[in-house]
């Protein structure tokens, strides 16, 4: 069996930061990919949160 090569693209999970701080039940998460070579630090994107019904900051979790 051939060994699978590790690519530069990895799948990451983005989680809403404002949802955790508010104490409301539920969580808003998105799955996306990033290039490990070009983006070494953690991703931080503005995405829509359907529970809060507005755009919030989503950070990469491990």
Curated annotation (Swiss-Prot):
GO molecular function: structural constituent of ribosome
Residue ranges that the Swiss-Prot or TrEMBL entry lists as coiled coil: none
Pfam families recorded: Ribosomal_L33
Top-rank lineage group of the source organism: Bacteria
UniProt record, GO biological process: translation
This protein's UniProt keywords: Ribonucleoprotein, Ribosomal protein
Keyword Metal-binding carried by entry: no
GO cellular component, as recorded: cytoplasm; ribonucleoprotein complex; ribosome
Keyword Ribosomal protein in record: yes
Family: Belongs to the bacterial ribosomal protein bL33 family.
HAMAP family according to UniProt: Ribosomal_bL33
Protein name per its UniProtKB record: Large ribosomal subunit protein bL33
Protein species of origin: Phocaeicola vulgatus (strain ATCC 8482 / DSM 1447 / JCM 5826 / CCUG 4940 / NBRC 14291 / NCTC 11154)
Gene behind the chain: rpmG
């Amino acid at each position: 069996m051939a060994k699978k090569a590790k690519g530069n693209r990895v799948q990451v999970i983005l989680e809403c930061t404002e949802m955790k701080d508010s104490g409301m039940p539920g969580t808003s998460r998105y799955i996306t990919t990033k290039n490990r070579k070009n983006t070494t630090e953690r991703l931080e994107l503005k995405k829509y949160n359907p529970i809060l019904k507005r755009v919030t900051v989503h950070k990469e979790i491990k």
